[in-house]
Curated annotation (Swiss-Prot):
Expression by tissue: Expressed by the venom gland.
Source organism phylogeny: Eukaryota, Metazoa, Ecdysozoa, Arthropoda, Chelicerata
Protein name: U3-lycotoxin-Ls1a
Compartments where found: Secreted
Single GO MF annotation: toxin activity
Domain statement: The presence of a 'disulfide through disulfide knot' structurally defines this protein as a knottin.
S-S bridge residues: 48-63, 55-72, 62-87, 74-85
Signal peptide: 1-20
């Protein structure tokens, strides 16, 4: 009985050691893969298109404002046949940013009064 118990403990120890080595190998492979993905992402990053500039070349390249990303909006000017695309901020997001800015200022005043 003691022999079976010792043999079982030996097998459990051996199994845990081998699985720990396998996990270390997997973790190292994941870290290497993650680093290569980060390097590719940095290489892919480019300049954003400012507000009211042409974004027809890349409609997802508009810059971020304080809280929200601008949207590439396309339209046909009066009397024109070609489409014009510019980065713009939708009105509802503009109003939300103004409200957030006023709330920040009001919060600062309250903090100054009571803080």
């Amino acid at each position: 009985m003691k022999f079976v118990l010792l043999f079982g403990v030996f097998l459990v120890t051996l199994f845990s050691y081998s699985s720990a080595e396998m996990l270390d190998d997997f973790d190292q492979a994941d870290e290497d893969e993650l680093l290569s993905l980060i390097e590719k992402e940095e290489a892919r990053a480019k300049e954003c298109t400012p507000r009211f500039y042409d974004c027809s070349h890349d409609r997802h390249s508009c810059c971020r404002s304080e809280l929200f990303k601008d949207v590439c909006t396309c339209f046909y000017p009066e009397g024109g046949d070609n489409e014009v695309c510019t980065c713009q901020q939708p009105k509802h997001l503009k109003y939300m940013e103004k409200a957030a800015d006023k709330a920040k200022k009001f919060g600062g005043k309250i903090k100054k009064w009571f803080g």
